[in-house]
């Protein structure tokens, strides 16, 4: 284990110093996450608002061969091409830049649009849009604004609970730097967007914090809600199983009746499946509708072959199966930049679009994540490894013909152990850590700008 790992809880007494220590610990567990949350809010919000005020929406896209550009308007990429109405007042500048891409899907669902005629909505799990709808009904705010508020509050809660969980196994320094690493990660703007990343982070971290404390009732309740938020919620069963066995051993007699609580989290999938059947979308509609994102079945080796070499795959379309060309990772944007390094080109919609479509970010993040996983097998608590391995493997079994590693830079965000492992590697390299955090923060600012103007990021 790491030298920063705490092998046991510090002993305390019943005297005044113990109470002060607890008070100080409580204050620190709130103050530092709040500071990190505020810094993240300022970076992402300033970038998004400036982009919306002074930038222009994407105006091009590739034609099918990916060799030339054709005119296209960014907002047309919204759910079913249904361009959302502009928000008014402060919401136009603060919220509207963060409702793009999947944000339009969640807004559509929040307005009650699970239906056979809009079958792709079945792919979006219900807890987040239901909360959007509930808050909108209470406050009278648009559903997008409700989602924006929920995401920010959930991210603050996620940071607080992440700090508490990390401190159970590591030092204060590791906990603090892990929060910083998470908040300034280049794609961390999704925590501010009308997406499920913040809510899922809060629920998954709270699930494992409760299990780590042997509070299994709270753990399974939080896991149930996580499963109602994203399909990856059911994968929390792996780290929960590790913690349960570590706490109760292999004697089956010691497992019961607590082991019966394991029936609670899967009920999230059962309830959602049943709900979809009432909308004529099928019990497994959330999985069956993945074809609308051009996903196909493959083993991880085939997925990476498509990433680096390109491939041909049969995918389902609205008119039936067809052969799709899967384009490999591209450095065309770099070649173009070397040939034309002028500022006018760097800020052009063509260059920014090429960067977004290149898949370079997908590849770098995926490789980095697996490197951290391998190192973490020796340096992290066992349940940390079981926390991150399943949600990293499953997307490799269902790549998209658009981008084989589509959304991986977003999928890693709630996987807290990856950030803890990165901090452990950098803990004795302060200058390098500060430099990387600075570069990451700059990339966060730039990618937030990209997202706000309808360029693809993850």
What are these regions (language model features)?
Residues 133-137, 146-169, 368-375:
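Transmembrane-helix motifs of polytopic, lipid-linked glycan transferases
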């Amino acid at each position: 284990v790491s030298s920063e790992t705490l092998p046991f809880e510090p002993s305390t007494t019943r005297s005044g110093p113990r109470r002060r220590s607890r008070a100080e610990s409580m204050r620190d567990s709130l103050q530092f996450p709040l500071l990190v949350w505020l810094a993240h809010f300022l970076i992402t919000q300033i970038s998004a608002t400036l982009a919306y005020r002074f930038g222009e929406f994407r105006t091009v896209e590739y034609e099918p061969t990916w060799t030339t550009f054709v005119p296209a308007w960014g907002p047309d990429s919204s759910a079913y091409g249904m361009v959302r109405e502009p928000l008014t007042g402060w919401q136009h500048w603060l919220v509207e830049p963060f409702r793009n891409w999947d944000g339009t899907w969640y807004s559509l669902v929040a307005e009650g649009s699970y239906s056979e005629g809009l079958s792709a909505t079945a792919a979006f799990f219900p807890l987040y849009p239901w909360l959007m709808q509930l808050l909108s009904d209470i406050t009278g705010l648009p559903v997008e604004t409700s989602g924006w508020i929920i995401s920010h509050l959930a991210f603050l809660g996620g940071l607080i609970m992440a700090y508490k969980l990390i401190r159970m196994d590591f030092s204060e320094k590791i906990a603090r730097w892990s929060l910083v690493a998470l908040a300034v990660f280049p794609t961390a703007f999704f925590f501010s967007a009308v997406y499920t990343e913040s809510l899922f982070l809060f629920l998954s971290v709270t699930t494992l914090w409760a299990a780590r404390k042997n509070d299994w009732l709270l753990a399974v309740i939080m896991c149930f809600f996580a499963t109602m938020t994203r399909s990856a919620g059911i994968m929390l069963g792996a780290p929960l199983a590790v913690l349960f066995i570590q706490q109760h051993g292999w004697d089956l007699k010691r497992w019961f009746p607590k082991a019966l609580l394991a029936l609670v989290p899967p009920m999230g999938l059962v309830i959602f499946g049943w709900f979809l059947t009432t909308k004529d979308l099928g019990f497994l509609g959330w999985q069956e509708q993945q074809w609308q994102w051009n996903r196909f079945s493959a083993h991880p080796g085939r997925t990476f072959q498509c990433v680096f070499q390109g491939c041909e795959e049969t995918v389902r379309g609205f008119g039936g199966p067809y052969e799709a060309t899967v384009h490999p990772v591209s450095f065309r944007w770099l070649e173009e930049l070397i040939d034309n390094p002028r500022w006018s080109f760097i800020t052009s919609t063509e260059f920014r679009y090429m960067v977004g479509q290149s898949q370079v970010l997908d590849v770098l993040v995926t490789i980095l994540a697996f490197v951290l996983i391998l190192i973490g097998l020796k340096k992290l608590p066992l349940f940390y490894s079981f926390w991150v391995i399943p949600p990293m493997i499953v997307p490799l079994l269902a790549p998209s013909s658009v981008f084989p590693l589509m959304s991986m830079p977003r999928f890693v965000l709630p996987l807290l152990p990856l950030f803890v492992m990165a901090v452990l590697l950098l803990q004795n390299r302060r200058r390098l850590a500060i430099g990387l955090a600075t570069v990451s923060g700059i990339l966060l600012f730039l990618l937030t700008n990209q997202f706000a103007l309808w360029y693809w990021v993850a």
